[in-house]
Amino acid sequence: MADPNKGINSLELNEGHSEWYVVTEAECINSLDTMEELFEESTDGSIVSNLIDDSEELEEGNSLALYNEQLTEDCNRAILALKRKLTKTPLKSQDRTVADLSPRLEAVTISPQRQSKRRLFEDSGLGEDEATNSIEKKVVSNSLESNESGTLVVETDSIFRSTNRKATLLAKFKEYFGVAYGDLTRPFKSDRSCCENWVISVCAAAEEVIEASKTVMQQHCDFLQVISYGFYALYLVKFKTAKSRDTIMKLFSLTLNVQEQQLMCDPPKSRSTPTALYFYRRSFGNASFIYGPFPDWLAKLTMLDHESAASSEQFELAQMIQFAYDNNLTTESEIAYKYALLADSDANAAAFLKSNQQVKYVRDCYAMLRYYKRQEMKDMSISEWIWKCCDDCNQEGNWKLIAQFLRYQEVNFISFLCALKTLFKGIPKRNCLVFWGPPDTGKSYICSSLTRFMQGKVVSFMNRHSQFWLQPLQDCKLGFLDDATFQCWQYMDVNMRNALDGNHISLDLKHKAPLQIKLPPLLITTNVDVENEASLMYLKSRLVFFKFPNKLPLKENDEVLYEITDASWKCFFIKFASHLELTARGDEQHESGRSDRAFRCTAGTNTESI
């Protein structure tokens, strides 16, 4: 085998014995000195201190934030030390109760304890430090304010985050006020319908604002009741003027600093006794505030008197008929409207409004009223009827205006009186007066005034195609046909000869059998000279003619010169009663010829003893 050391002269040199050595291989050095390390190590042996800054460079931070943080920690430690020094423990203060120290600690108990007795007045504070009480009260008030604000935010968020805000408001209303919102109000579909009385519910409003609204709202209303529970309030308001829902929503949203979604507004059930009792009973509680007297609808349902106690809620038609008869109401609309106005003072009228058959009652009342009036008129003679019409007129007039107007139209006044006398007596062939002449001569003027005074009826020939056009003549003492044309005279010549004679005829009535009747005295105006018309010769003997040739005189202001009114005819009949052979007024009878006892269509009632 070959020798590994061949060709190499091996020298064994001992360290220290020779200054030379042969480098056979390179040494492995792990770390080499860099330029920075050389400079850093060069100062290790320096005798000058801090000649070169060897500290590490630090990044510049937020010194102000650090200072505030340190200052806050120092303050908190100082406050904590002060609290520990001044606050007494329950073991050291036996006179103070747990409830006085903290309301929340009262609920945390290990063993059952007896509740402390309520004190009417706070402790005088002798022997205690005033600083302790002030600090405790301030801490408690701040915690309560934070709790209230947090609760208000939660209540508001629960409403606006709800998918059905209406249902949420209704549920909250019933939870706080103990009754459903629909039980107190009647819904208004339109937001522009006006009403004086309103019920307003407010949800999630600040207590301070609700308290301030009790004073602010007084300028807008006559009555105000506020029932408040925390952030919820219920208003019963009677405004000075009727307002709509839109107006009320804007008013309350500005006054209470809430949105319209937090409000509910509807009129109260003004005819519901439970609704009235709810607000009336709540008025005695501490949570209720009242300004002004109760509304009429609430007072009527809650306050009793001797009249309401004795009255019956059942509607009586006879009382309605008596009212219409006493007030001389002659149309259905007039009866319904004026009787409804009595609902505030008359129990029977209130029962009429509550009924679902008002239309039927009005028709029945009108029908019975016509029956009574018709028979009353038939039982009177023409003289009694004229005296009745005179009594109905409360004014005084001058009969000379009638005489002057007839003289102006060249009519003999004595002939006119004789014609009226035979007309009222119903003498055959003297039962119709005809006033004819040129237009605008006052024919219709004098006839209309006499018909109005005697409460007569007017018929028109334009309704001739109906067989019932003469039906109104059955309910009057005097009839009037205005402006009869030539065709009208031809119709009367063919169909009404017996009627003009003053004899009985068969009169067609709607929905009834023909009536045997004698037509009342008639007044007719026309522009046709019937007296000289050859084709109407058979009517001449049945009519009494008065010609008006002159145009009706007027004043400068276009008013009639001879103003003939009901008072003028009243004075005329009183003046010429003997000439017309009217029955004199008896001493034992009423002025109108009737008995002093008034007509009564209601059943008599016994007066209850008190």
Swiss-Prot record:
Motif (Nuclear localization signal): 83-85
The SF3 helicase domain, residue ranges: 411-561
Name assigned to this protein: Replication protein E1
Alphabetical list of SUPFAM superfamilies matching this protein: Origin of replication-binding domain, RBD-like, P-loop containing nucleoside triphosphate hydrolases
Catalyzed reaction equations: Couples ATP hydrolysis with the unwinding of duplex DNA by translocating in the 3'-5' direction; ATP + H2O = ADP + phosphate + H(+)
Family classification: Belongs to the papillomaviridae E1 protein family.
PTM-bearing positions, type Phosphoserine: 93, 102
Region feature (DNA-binding region): 148-312
GO terms for biological process, alphabetical: DNA replication
Gene Ontology molecular function: ATP binding; ATP hydrolysis activity; DNA binding; DNA helicase activity
Subcellular compartments: Host nucleus
Subunit structure comment from the entry: Can form hexamers. Interacts with E2 protein; this interaction increases E1 DNA binding specificity. Interacts with host DNA polymerase subunit POLA2. Interacts with host single stranded DNA-binding protein RPA1. Interacts with host TOP1; this interaction stimulates the enzymatic activity of TOP1.
Annotated function: ATP-dependent DNA 3'-5' helicase required for initiation of viral DNA replication. It forms a complex with the viral E2 protein. The E1-E2 complex binds to the replication origin which contains binding sites for both proteins. During the initial step, a dimer of E1 interacts with a dimer of protein E2 leading to a complex that binds the viral origin of replication with high specificity. Then, a second dimer of E1 displaces the E2 dimer in an ATP-dependent manner to form the E1 tetramer.
Binding residue positions for ATP: 437-444
Glycyl lysine isopeptide (Lys-Gly) (interchain with G-Cter in SUMO) cross-link, chain position(s): 518
PTM annotation, UniProt: Phosphorylated. Sumoylated.
InterPro entries: Helicase_SF3_DNA-vir, P-loop_NTPase, PPV_DNA_helicase_E1_C, PPV_DNA_helicase_E1_N, PPV_E1_DBD, PPV_E1_DBD_sf, Rep_E1_papillomaV, Znf_lg_T-Ag_D1_dom_sf
Protein origin, superkingdom: Viruses
Motif, Nuclear export signal: chain positions: 101-110
First-level EC class: isomerase
GO cellular component, one term: host cell nucleus
Keywords: ATP-binding, DNA replication, DNA-binding, Early protein, Helicase, Host nucleus, Hydrolase, Isomerase, Isopeptide bond, Nucleotide-binding, Phosphoprotein, Ubl conjugation
